[in-house]
């Protein structure tokens, strides 16, 4: 099994209240990006990496790749206006010889090697697989400030990344999205629309997406606890 990895690292740090792009914010003395780089570098089935970064941060990303000791070929590209655009741009740079593509958000620095490998294994079997966790909170549908419906959570899962797919399936899904002007918040949504089976592998509650200062604080605490072990 040969896989390409994509790290989506083109997000801004605006909601974090930071001047630097989110992937370059430091946690425990290291950038968010560096955490994903080190995990990907440890997975033997991943043969190449494409990183989508904000315009002007290509050199900074290359320095992170070097510091992380990544030995596979790495391409760095400027991301698009939206996440979906960044992934589409990155897919075009992956090798057509790859069986699978695994997509990961740099804003989830706590994803583990185990989660990546589980996604890749499931995707090789089913066509697609994502990390996710069972929903813990009760959901309410609200209209005009009042509860309209309580949604049963028994079968609901909260999607995370990494998300892995057969390369041909992911390419076709993004091409279809362009042709039909489909906008989605993750790649699994686009792939599901093609009729491909997308399986779920259990992620981790620590694998949160850092969007707000409170998210950053949680991950900083997780990292500090690990460093103290």
What do these predicted regions represent?
Residues 75, 81-146, 160, 167:
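Conserved beta-loop-beta/alpha segment of the NTase-like Rossmann-fold superfamily
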Residues 34-98, 178:
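Conserved N-terminal catalytic core of the sugar/cofactor nucleotidyltransferase
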Residues 16, 61-65, 119, 139, ...:
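Hydrophobic packing residues within well-ordered alpha-helices of enzyme cores
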Residues 81, 156-229:
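Conserved alpha/beta core of the MobA/IspD/sugar-nucleotide pyrophosphorylase nucleotidyltransferase superfamily
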